[in-house]
Structure formats: C-alpha cells, structure tokens
C-alpha cells in the first residue's frame, strides 16, 4: 500500500471517530488502572500533540477540520460514558472545558495545518501551539512535569524540524 493511500485510509473522519472512541475509553481506564498513564492522558498537552499530528498529516485544511472534530467528540463521549459506568468522579467544569475544546477543535486544526506551510505566519502559529501547550500545563495542572517536556519537545520537533510532504495537487472538495 502506498504511503499516501495508507495515510488517507488512516486519516478520514470515520477512522478518526473510531480512534477517538477507543482513546476515550483507554484514557478513562488509564485513570483507574494505570495512574501514570492516566495522569498523562488527563493533560491538555497530549491532546494538543495528537490533534496537531492529525491536523498536519491531513492532506488539506478542510480534511484537518473534518478529521479532528469526530476524533475529539468520540474521545469526549466515550471518556464520560466510561466514567459514568465506572462510577468515576468528575466535575462539571471539566466536562464543559473539554466540550468547548472539542467544539473549537476544527478551528484549531485549521491553524495547526497551516503551521506546516511556508512563511513567517506559519512559524507564529507553530510557536502559539507550543506556547498554549506549555501554558496549559502550568495554568491548568500547576506545573510542567517530565512528560510535559517530552510532549512539548515532540511538538517542537514536529512543528519546526520534521518535513511533511504535501501533495501540490489537491481536490477542491477537500481544501
């Protein structure tokens, strides 16, 4: 299977929904059974990294937006359904916060996709993505932890150093 056809098989709204559904369940089970993984997957930084990867590897801005929304909504729904089934404790403010995050994720995906385009504006966007990841760890979760440095280091590498091949030929419906 060619790399681009493999990418389109993996990066489409249905597969992203399924991935989000599975990661939502996994994140909740990590909270229960694997405290360290639960801690990592409760942080916004890991979801910023995953969302950025989905967006930048999507073939177009429109595809990035269409891929990230079902991913985030799937993750959100199954996380809280699993939390309810397992009698988990969670606050309404967390539900509201993550719902807002999921609802604005297509806009964030649009800009994340743009971060890999040439030019100064793309570097400003990339810097903003990393800054939001760092600041969210400090403001929402008190401090930067070792895994935050690893996640943010991965973001820096992906956004500033990793080369992404994008096709020059794009279909109108997918731009």
How does the language model describe each region?
Residues 47-56, 101-113, 152-162:
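Hydrophobic cores of alpha-helical transmembrane segments in multi-pass inner/ER membrane proteins
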Residues 20-28, 72-82, 129-140:
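Aromatic-anchored segments of alpha-helical transmembrane domains
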């Amino acid at each position: 299977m060619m790399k681009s056809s493999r990418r389109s098989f993996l990066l489409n709204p249905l597969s992203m929904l399924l991935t989000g559904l599975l990661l939502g369940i996994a994140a909740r089970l990590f909270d229960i059974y694997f405290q360290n993984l639960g801690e990592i997957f409760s942080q916004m930084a890991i979801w910023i990294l995953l969302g950025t990867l989905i967006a930048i590897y999507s073939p177009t801005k429109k595809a990035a937006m269409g891929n990230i929304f079902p991913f985030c909504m799937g993750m959100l729904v199954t996380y809280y359904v699993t939390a309810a089934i397992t009698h988990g404790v969670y606050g309404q403010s967390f539900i509201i916060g993550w719902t807002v995050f999921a609802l604005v994720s297509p806009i964030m995906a649009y800009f994340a996709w743009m971060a890999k385009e040439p030019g100064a504006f793309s570097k400003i966007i990339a810097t903003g993505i990393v800054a939001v990841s760092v600041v969210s760890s400090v403001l929402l979760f008190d401090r930067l932890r070792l895994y935050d440095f690893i996640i943010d280091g991965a973001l820096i590498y992906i956004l500033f150093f990793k080369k992404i091949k994008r096709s020059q030929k794009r279909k109108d419906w997918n731009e």
